[in-house]
Amino acid sequence: MESTIPAKPDFSNKVFAKDERFWLNYLEGRPTAPKSFFDRIYRYHEEHRGHFGTVHDVGAGNGPYAKELRLKFSHVIVSDIAAENVTLAQERLGNDGFQYRVSRLEDADDIPPGSVDMVFATNVLHFCDQDVAMRALARQLRPGGTFACASFGSAYFADEKVQEIYTRIGRAGARLLLKTLDDPERLLRAMDRTDGTYNVAPLDEKLFMPGAQRVDLNMPERGMLSPLPPEMEVTERDESHTRPSDVLIQEEEDEWKFSMNIGQIKAHIESFPFGKDVATELSPLWREMENLVQDRRIDGHWPAKIILATRADASVE
């Protein structure tokens, strides 16, 4: 199927809509999901007798993972809230086996119920209304289909001084971004969900089978690192979305390790929505980083969270 379905995004383009230069930097500065990441998802899908017909890549940005998904699935739906991102995805990926939508993740009434074999949601679900989003995703999944959710992006550096400056840059950048938004509370809640356990995806037992997997890869004791400024209060904090029946898995994988020079560290920081401010408001902090790192390579790893669940044989009211 080949089509472009228009919609009206309702969240600030200051967070989501990015140009081609940003996405080129994103591909350079963010972790490359290793083969083991996709192998785990496909293996889970196969073990639960999933089909490889249609996958919906939600909150896809410019579709950095869509090409990989197309290698396994006959049809890939690429959706994002920002029209600019979807246009870039279509220009890069073409129309052979791809369909494009401009839409919030929560808005999916145009997708026929039970028509999707897998929903693939990477680095996006924390921005959404959790209950509304999960009902929308469950509605489009066929019984036995797979919900595959993941988050990765913030680095953990082995050098404690580098990590400390990196944390300060992230928090300072978040403060700048929050000042530009009409609804900063929404972004605060999103950042809060990414801190620690990556608290997303309430799995209603009527919609998803018991035994869902919540996988921590290379996870530090404190969990994931969010840029949430410590002085900013989140007025409505989510309760834990982990069910008693969920299977908790902790593993280490060498494929998520890295060694960065100063240029690569800069590319990584510039891959965040506040990245453009490195050359302006954040320049004093960046000079601290340059003076500390100089010509060294800094080792570290990418913590990752993967959530895998199977659609139950039930309707969504």
From Swiss-Prot:
Q: Which UniProt keywords apply?
A: Methyltransferase, S-adenosyl-L-methionine, Transferase
Which top-rank group of organisms is this from? Eukaryota
Q: Where is this region: Methyltransferase domain?
A: 57-149
Specify the pathway: Pigment biosynthesis
- Cystine links in this protein are none
> What triggers its expression?
Expression correlates with the formation of the sclerotia and thus the pigment production and is directly regulated by the cluster-specific activator CPUR_05433.
One GO BP annotation of this record: methylation
Q: Give the GO molecular function terms.
A: S-adenosylmethionine-dependent methyltransferase activity
Query: Could you tell me the EC number(s) of this protein?
Result: 2.1.1.-
Keyword Ribonucleoprotein tagged: no
Is the keyword Ion transport in the record? Answer: no
Q: Which family does it belong to?
A: Belongs to the methyltransferase superfamily.
Relate the protein's function as given in its record.
Methyltransferase; part of the ergochrome gene cluster responsible for the typical purple-black color of the ergot sclerotia. The ergochrome gene cluster produces several ergot pigments including the yellow ergochrome secalonic acid and its derivatives, as well as the red anthraquinones endocrocin and clavorubin. The pathway begins with the synthesis of atrochrysone thioester by the polyketide synthase (PKS) CPUR_05437. The atrochrysone carboxyl ACP thioesterase CPUR_05436 then breaks the thioester bond and releases the atrochrysone carboxylic acid from CPUR_05437.
What PANTHER family is this protein classified in? METHYLTRANSF_11 DOMAIN-CONTAINING PROTEIN, METHYLTRANSFERASE TYPE 11 DOMAIN-CONTAINING PROTEIN
Tell me what this protein is called.
Answer: Methyltransferase CPUR_05424
What is the organism field in this record? Claviceps purpurea (strain 20.1) (Ergot fungus)
